[in-house]
Curated annotation (Swiss-Prot):
Protein name listed in UniProt: Protein GrpE
HAMAP family attached to this UniProt entry: GrpE
Keywords for this protein: Chaperone, Cytoplasm, Stress response
Encoding gene (name): grpE
InterPro entries: GrpE, GrpE_coiled_coil, GrpE_head
Keyword field contains Lyase: no
Protein's organism: Erwinia tasmaniensis (strain DSM 17950 / CFBP 7177 / CIP 109463 / NCPPB 4357 / Et1/99)
């Protein structure tokens, strides 16, 4: 045997140790790589879950916004239908006022005017009936509590017959359209004597 072929037992042990160490280093490197891979997988899964949560949240917000837009559109259409007659109704109020004034100043004692007065009265009643069909209501009762939302106080008068802060006299009737004020009633409000 040549000297190269002969390995001393120390050399053989040293070779085995190096081989063992190389195997251990390879195993350690493989374990580290596996750990890094597992960490990266965990990070990516966390990012995926977070982005999916964000997508779900965005989807829910979008659905809620669509529902809100739909509801607002329905309300707008409902209001448009309900109050479409507001301008037209406001234009009719002076006509009703004129008919009322004509009845107030008409000479009811003159028999020659009786037919005309009756015609004006029927015309006014017919016009009021027509506007009521479309939601126009009269505000003009007396002996009711003064309500600043539908009454405009023109004066205050002392009275023993009418309770204080109640409508004593209506100077001009007011009107509402489906609960919305078209014109306040101009009234005199009672106050206690004192």
């Amino acid at each position: 045997m040549s000297s190269k072929e002969q390995n001393t037992p120390n050399e053989q042990a040293s070779d085995e140790i190096e081989t063992e160490q190389a195997k251990n280093q390879g195993a350690d490197t493989a374990a580290e790589a596996a750990d890094q891979r597992d960490e990266r997988i965990a990070q990516l899964e966390a990012q995926l879950a977070e982005s999916q949560g964000g997508v779900r949240d965005a989807q829910l917000r979008a659905q809620a916004e669509i529902e809100n837009i739909r509801r607002r559109a329905e309300l707008d259409v409902e209001k448009a239908h309900k109050f479409a007659l507001e301008k037209f109704s406001n234009e009719l109020l002076p006509v009703i006022d004129s008919l009322e004034r004509a009845l107030e100043v008409a000479d009811k004692s003159n028999p020659e005017l009786a037919a005309m007065i009756e015609g004006i009265d029927l015309t006014m009643k017919s016009l009021l009936g027509a506007v009521r069909k479309f939601g126009v209501e009269v505000v003009g009762d007396t002996n009711v509590p003064f309500n600043p939302e539908v009454h405009q106080a023109m004066s205050m008068m002392e009275s023993e017959e009418v309770e204080p802060n109640h409508v004593m006299m209506v100077m001009q009737r007011g009107y509402t359209l489906n609960g919305r004020l078209l014109r306040p009633a101009m009234v005199a409000v009672a106050k206690s004597k004192g």
